[in-house]
Amino acid sequence: MKILIVSDEESPYLWDYYTPGRLAGIDMILSAGDLKASYLSFLVTMANRPLLYVPGNHDAAYAAAPPEGCDCVDGKLVTVNGLRILGFGGSPMYSGGPHQYTERQMEARIRKLGWKIRRAGGRLRGPSKRTSAQDEAFCAA
């Protein structure tokens, strides 16, 4: 499966200088946030493939005008073409803006989906034994 992953900056190669066939062979597009809704709508239209996204810390506008033709997977466990995808958008808390989370808030978001993760054959792991606060975030396996 070929997956195009995009985030943070629109690619002129795909956006400004698009030519038919440029996205040929792509099976799915994943957006990790901080892109214009119009860019994502363009990609899903031109590729004619599923586009899944999570909002980034600069995507507050998605609430009023989400990308057309795209699926938000923030806080969801989905299966596309046999591939399980768990989406968590946002960033570490730095200014209190939308889609910013403390470690405890992100841990709570993950634990909320614990039953879906386990039902899909995954498991939740607790904090690592490392001392770095960044390394102690809970993760889904």
Protein language model features and the residues they cover:
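N-terminal active-site segment of His-dependent metallophosphoesterases
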Residues: 1-46, 117, 128
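Structured loop/turn residues at beta-strand edges in well-structured enzyme cores
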Residues: 24, 49, 136-137
